[in-house]
Amino acid sequence: MLSLIIPAKELDECLFETIYNYTLTFNHDYEIIIVYDFTDKKVYEKFNNNFNNNKKIILLLSPIKGRINALNYGYTQSKGDIIKCIDADDTLLSSYFDELEIMDNYSAHCHNASLIDGNNKVIGTYTFEKNILFKDYQYVLSNLKSPPRWVWSFNREIAECIFPIPPELFAEDVWFSLIIKKNCNKIFHLNSEVYLYKQHDGGEWGGVKNFSAEVMSLRARWNLKLIPVLLKNKISLGIVSDDIFSNIISYYKVLLNKKSISNIILSKTTIYYKAKLFLIMYSPSLATLLISIKWLVSKQLIAIKKS
């Protein structure tokens, strides 16, 4: 059985429509666990009246507010052999289930997504990063490779390594990525778009293709806050030396400063990160174009390597 855990700040009409559609299109063994911080009484009654007799839909008021606390609590209430944690404003397509049985042969499973705007119009695609699949754990760790957590599905053995997520983390994506890469011998990649990933220009991370100075500075600040928490969990993450993050820390620190060629050149990071800094800081629109091309190429390269 699949346990689909959805953290939500509140129960709303959009989430209701999404869950209702799931009940119409999901024909496999599943449970949907929605963990919310608060809700309007009328909306709650709508959820309750429609799903109260459906044992597959579980509504839980989180005992502690916050996304990570909701995920942790949701997992404790789950019963599935496979766990997946998605976002309340996104959509998992029923085609995802076509490959679910292959999870019997893999500890973890990942996939691509279609990017949609606020009107649910497809505006692009997101391809899972091939380096996470084909490079070693130290590469993923040192570069803090962290695709969105919704890309992942994993068995309970891996889930026991992931949960509880350290509640002091600002964002949990990197925790999922590192724990899964470290503990999985094999990861299956479904090289197709089985998820609709909604983009919000004013969202927490600014949209996956947004490389504006303001957004990149915020991301850098938030990511720097993650590192001390990761270092507190050295054993779980297999961190041998604090220096493993030195290049990525230097990269983030440059992003926090005003645009300066000298800051980039003199930064104590790799040539790769210096080139990335020049691109993002001096031509963010080109960075947006190149990431789109990268995802298209990655999809083809992954297909070739798997064939």
Whereabouts are the PLM-identified features?
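C-terminal subregions of glycosyltransferases and related glycan-biosynthesis enzymes
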Residues: 24, 169, 182, 198-307
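Cell-envelope/extracellular polymer assembly enzymes that use nucleotide-activated donors
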Residues: 1-3, 31, 175
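Glycine-rich, basic loop-to-helix element that forms the pyrophosphate-binding segment
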Residues: 62-78
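Short, well-formed alpha-helical segments that are part of the catalytic scaffolds
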Residues: 10-24
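Acidic donor-binding segment of Leloir-type glycosyltransferases
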Residues: 20-60
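Conserved nucleotide-sugar donor-binding catalytic segment
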Residues: 135-210
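Short aromatic/hydrophobic "clamp" motif used to bind/position activated sugar donors
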Residues: 83
